UniProtKB/Swiss-Prot annotation:
Organism of this sequence: Zinnia elegans
Tagged with keyword Calcium: yes
Pfam families, A to Z: Pectate_lyase_4
Protein name listed in UniProt: Pectate lyase
Family: Belongs to the polysaccharide lyase 1 family.
Protein purpose: Involved in the degradation of pectin. May assist in the removal and modification of an existing pectin matrix in order to allow the deposition of newly synthesized walls polymers for a specialized function or to create an architecture that is extensible.
Cofactor binding mode and count: Binds 1 Ca(2+) ion. Required for its activity.
Length: 401
């Protein structure tokens, strides 16, 4: 993860943005999710898709989606449900996939859009391949919306969310991300600073909150596909298609970084596909709801963690590899069994195929997992239909997406 030299006053003010205090009570969140889903169904009426995926059913069957893009912000669920992105801001159209100047970005480029102070809903004029020279450091209250076009960010450094809030990233391809840094990068119209070498993540979330990563296709990055660290919280990672990668997702900076104890992340309706090895996710300290995902490939393990994270696995489908000694879904790391047996890891309603098994630990009482519950999971038998369209969608104006 890159770091930047900031004035002390900017650093202090940013701590308020990245507070890692936990979200409201899980019961309140679940009630709000149900209210939001029901309201969305009423608003769509006969347009509702009926896939069982509450995010997709909220917006995808509206043929007028291109003229009502910001309605997407009503459809988030889970711990990141309050991520508004650039809602109520201007629509900003990216017209130039090149000219990536990290310090003085050119109007019309993606970098120029994401550093602005005002809320912006960012869309793209046409299909684009964007190869960045340095990390794309996002300012708060931004949506990157790739619907209706084919947008790739890759073959260079990729996306960083650093001391920011209210970010939505939707509908783009992120792949072949590389390390960069040791140079100046602008992160607002009024500030640029020196950034050290980045890790080469697809999306790096650092000390940020109210983040929603939805319907993206991610693969083959230098480090993680999506990493969230340093007190980041209130995050939903949903409907993404991930392939061809080793260390897929890290949630929590290190075993010694206790500020991640209040991290809350929802991982829902994703497809973990071919060529994946481990960390789907790898968790530390916080509270993680892994719900209604499709795990069709892993080489080492699917869900792991250390430093006593609370992991609630609900309604997922796990298809184990054919190799005899890699069928365990879980991996308790950096601790003897005498210690990890007390970590709260629970499997509820998961479908285990080809010999897959989940090694539970800790308490069985519902209260042990209350802070890791973020929505009402659906039966695992519905996972195939709920995740069938995971990844960046092919959407055409005037038609259902």
């Amino acid at each position: 993860m890159a770091t930047t030299i900031l004035p002390l006053i900017l650093f202090i003010s940013s701590l308020a943005i990245a507070s890692s205090s936990p979200s409201r009570t899980p019961h309140a969140i679940v009630n709000e999710v149900h209210k939001s889903i029901n309201a969305s169904r009423r608003n769509l009426g006969y347009l509702s898709c009926g896939t069982g995926n509450p995010i997709d059913d909220c917006w995808r069957c509206d043929p007028n989606w291109a003229n009502n893009r910001q309605r997407l912000a009503d459809c988030a669920i889970g711990f990141g449900k309050n991520a508004m992105g650039g809602r109520n801001g201007r629509i900003y159209v990216v017209t130039d996939p090149g000219n990536d100047d990290p310090v003085n970005p050119v109007p019309g480029t993606l970098r120029y859009a994401v550093i602005q102070d005002e809320p912006l809903w960012i869309i793209f004029k046409r299909d684009m391949v964007i190869q960045l020279r340095q990390e794309l450091v996002m300012n708060s209250h931004k949506t990157i919306d790739g619907r209706g076009v084919n947008v790739h960010i890759g073959n260079g450094p990729c996306i960083t969310i650093h001391y920011a809030s209210n970010i939505i990233i939707h509908g783009i391809h992120i792949h072949d991300c590389k390390q960069a840094g040791n140079g100046n990068i602008r992160n607002s119209p009024h500030h640029s600073g020196w950034w050290t070498q980045s890790d080469g993540d697809g999306i790096s979330i650092f000390a940020s909150k109210d983040i929603w990563i939805d319907h993206n296709s991610l693969s083959n990055c230098h480090d993680g596909l999506i990493d969230a660290i340093h007190g980041s919280t209130a995050i939903t990672i949903s409907n993404n298609y991930m392939t061809h990668h080793d260390k897929v997702m890290l949630l929590g900076h290190s075993d010694s970084y206790t500020q991640d104890k209040n991290m809350q992340v929802t991982i829902a309706f994703n497809h973990f596909g071919e060529g994946l090895v481990q960390r789907m996710p790898r968790c530390r300290h916080g509270y993680f709801h892994v719900v209604n995902n499709d795990y069709t490939h892993w080489e080492m393990y699917a869900i792991g963690g250390s430093a006593s994270p609370t992991i609630y696995s609900q309604g997922n489908r796990f298809l184990a590899p054919n190799t005899r000694f890699d069928k365990e879904v879980t991996k308790h790391e950096n601790a003897p069994e005498s210690e990890w047996k007390n970590w709260n890891w629970r499997s509820e309603g998961d479908l285990m195929l080809n010999g897959a098994y989940f090694r539970e630990s800790g308490g069985r009482a519902a209260s042990s997992f209350a802070r890791a519950s973020s929505l009402s999971g659906r039966p695992s038998t519905l996972v195939a239909s709920m995740t069938r369209s995971a990844g960046a969608l092919v959407c055409r104006k005037g038609s259902r997406c």
